[in-house]
């Protein structure tokens, strides 16, 4: 919005020329999101408490979690506001990639909100059924995949970080692949969101990493030099990534241990979906497995646990997702959280290093 209102004035006032720079708008989208979280956050927490939108703690989990009983949840509403508003303010709203990503963020956010509302406000412990959630997740993600498949000039090849000359053509399989990436990322972040700040920290780091890749992918000269796919228009997504980083840090202010508020499904589903969409739009889907390694391991721990118990009658971990396994082994919650952040930072550096690996 500000881009469209103020950049045209650059012809008369050179000051407004800064609005053409992605770096400027990305930084200020981040700052706007952060300030918005600081200003609106306390009101959101109070409102959630007034609605009695309180987290229900599982009795079969670690005993230390029982003290979290009654902590407000659905704080992901704050995250969504802090992403959407700065993006609308600072991004080029003529860019179709911005609207595709916002579609997933808002769509998955609404889905998570309905699920949370049924659980914590209507006191329906089941919320939406897994089948209902999966249906809407797949529908939205497949819609993005179909749109991109028919979008003129958008490549349906698969690019590999370490093998830049190898990029197989997916053809029609591109649509289910996109669906898998977006839905998988969404649910992986959802499974990770089990400790104070455990999910939002890595999400912010992932968003910061993709900010860099979005900027490079949208720049013909840089992408050509670094031999990564050039995606015209992808650079504008750096503004949205900046808003995600700011929103993540702003929410962490309230979600850090001991948490004043939890994000709920409204936050985790939408953030994971956003990361998956960014990976698809920048043609860096495999990179998400690296930088989002914590989310991948959390999801795989659940898959292996369920599979092992179903077919062998034995559990691999004391409890899944794996962060609960470490809790039951006696590792303090803050230590688990910080260690997972450290791992994510290392993985982000590895992901960035692939820019120079051929």
Swiss-Prot record:
Subcellular location per the Swiss-Prot or TrEMBL entry: Cell inner membrane
Cofactor or coenzyme needed: Mg(2+)
GO biological process, one term: cell wall organization
Species of provenance: Geobacter sp. (strain M21)
NCBIfam families reported for this sequence: mraY
The family this protein is said to belong to: Belongs to the glycosyltransferase 4 family. MraY subfamily.
Known pathway: Cell wall biogenesis; peptidoglycan biosynthesis
Function: Catalyzes the initial step of the lipid cycle reactions in the biosynthesis of the cell wall peptidoglycan: transfers peptidoglycan precursor phospho-MurNAc-pentapeptide from UDP-MurNAc-pentapeptide onto the lipid carrier undecaprenyl phosphate, yielding undecaprenyl-pyrophosphoryl-MurNAc-pentapeptide, known as lipid I.
Catalytic reactions on record: UDP-N-acetyl-alpha-D-muramoyl-L-alanyl-gamma-D-glutamyl-meso-2,6-diaminopimeloyl-D-alanyl-D-alanine + di-trans,octa-cis-undecaprenyl phosphate = di-trans,octa-cis-undecaprenyl diphospho-N-acetyl-alpha-D-muramoyl-L-alanyl-D-glutamyl-meso-2,6-diaminopimeloyl-D-alanyl-D-alanine + UMP
Keywords, comma-separated and alphabetical: Cell cycle, Cell division, Cell inner membrane, Cell membrane, Cell shape, Cell wall biogenesis/degradation, Magnesium, Membrane, Metal-binding, Peptidoglycan synthesis, Transferase, Transmembrane, Transmembrane helix
GO CC annotation, single: plasma membrane
Lipid bilayer topology: Multi-pass membrane protein
The protein's name: Phospho-N-acetylmuramoyl-pentapeptide-transferase
Gene Ontology molecular function terms on file: metal ion binding; phospho-N-acetylmuramoyl-pentapeptide-transferase activity; UDP-N-acetylmuramoyl-L-alanyl-D-glutamyl-meso-2,6-diaminopimelyl-D-alanyl-D-alanine:undecaprenyl-phosphate transferase activity
Ranges that cross the membrane: 24-44, 73-93, 95-115, 134-154, 169-189, 197-217, 233-253, 261-281, 286-306, 335-355
Enzymatic class: transferase
EC number annotated for this UniProt entry: 2.7.8.13
């Amino acid at each position: 919005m500000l881009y469209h209102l103020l950049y045209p004035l650059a012809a008369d006032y050179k000051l407004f020329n800064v609005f053409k720079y992605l770096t400027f708008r990305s930084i200020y989208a981040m700052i706007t999101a952060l300030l918005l979280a600081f200003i609106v956050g306390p009101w959101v927490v109070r409102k959630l408490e007034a609605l009695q939108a309180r987290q229900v703690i599982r009795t079969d989990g670690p005993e230390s979690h029982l003290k979290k009983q009654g902590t407000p949840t659905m704080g992901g509403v704050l995250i969504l506001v802090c992403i959407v508003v700065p993006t609308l303010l600072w991004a080029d709203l003529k860019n179709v990639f911005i609207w595709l990503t916002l579609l997933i963020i808002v769509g998955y956010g609404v889905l998570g909100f309905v699920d949370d509302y049924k659980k914590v406000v209507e006191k329906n412990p089941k919320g939406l059924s897994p089948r209902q959630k999966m249906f809407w997740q797949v529908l939205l993600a497949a819609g993005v995949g179909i749109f991109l498949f028919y979008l003129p000039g958008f490549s349906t090849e698969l690019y590999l970080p370490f093998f830049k000359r190898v990029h197989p053509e997916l053809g029609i399989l591109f649509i289910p692949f996109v669906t898998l990436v977006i839905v998988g990322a969404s649910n992986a972040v959802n499974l990770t969101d089990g400790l104070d700040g455990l999910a939002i920290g890595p999400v912010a780091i992932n968003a910061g990493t993709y900010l860099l890749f979005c900027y490079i992918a949208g720049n013909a000269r840089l992408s050509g030099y670094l031999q990564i796919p050039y995606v015209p228009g992808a650079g504008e997504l750096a503004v949205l990534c900046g808003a995600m980083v700011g929103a993540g840090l702003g929410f962490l202010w309230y979600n850090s241990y001991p948490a004043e508020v939890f994000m709920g499904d409204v936050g985790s589903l939408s953030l994971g979906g956003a990361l998956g969409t960014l990976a698809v739009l920048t043609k860096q889907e495999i990179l998400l497995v690296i930088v989002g390694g914590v989310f991948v391991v959390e999801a795989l721990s659940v898959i292996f646990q369920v599979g092992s118990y179903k077919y062998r009658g034995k559990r691999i971990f004391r409890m899944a997702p794996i962060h609960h396994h470490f809790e039951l082994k006696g590792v303090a919650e803050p230590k688990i959280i910080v260690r997972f952040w450290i791992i994510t930072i290392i993985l982000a550096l590895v992901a960035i290093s692939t820019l120079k690996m051929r």
